[in-house]
């Protein structure tokens, strides 16, 4: 049995008007076209690893998973918590938004984006995985998913530089260097758990003679878990933080980890 969705407001009742108010502004011409143009050809089926791993269960076909949007619109948002739990189980446990299905769709229907819309709808009703909610809260408070403070981030960078001092004489990890060619960003798990990854990249930049820097303020975390629960507002904030730092430091390019 699939685990129940985390509910931010346990006693919150489902409000049909609230559901429709969430969906209507987002169902523009593009979404309407996608919802109406699907020919149920099944070409997306074999692209889905959930479909293949389940013994080709028809319920795992990507096009079938997004049926909930049309159902909710047809019902004018009049659904119960049990129905939304069914939606949750499908869009979180049977899809990871990899977009393989989108690449193979002859009509270019972005099924992952439709799944994201459903995840955003569930979030508006207080339903999302606890881990994602915690990460989103960390983004909002600290600017990164791992709740790393500015002080800890800078201290980690300085420690990495010190650790490599004997191995590579003259190696520096510039912080807030204006006019550098590259601003390097990382996965927030690196300063938290894997600082050696930062050190390896620093070695590459040093040997290559690259002109680079890292920002001290929010914008150094290049992950964006908010988009995986349909939180567009927070997802936008994360990206804007990175662009803001790049503009402030007047760099030419932004490079990301991995």
Regions found by a protein language model. Name each.
Residues 6-40, 45-82, 87:
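N-terminal cysteine/histidine-rich coordination modules
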Residues 1-2:
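Secretory targeting signatures
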Residues 25-28, 32-35, 65, 70-257:
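Iron-sulfur-cluster electron-transfer modules
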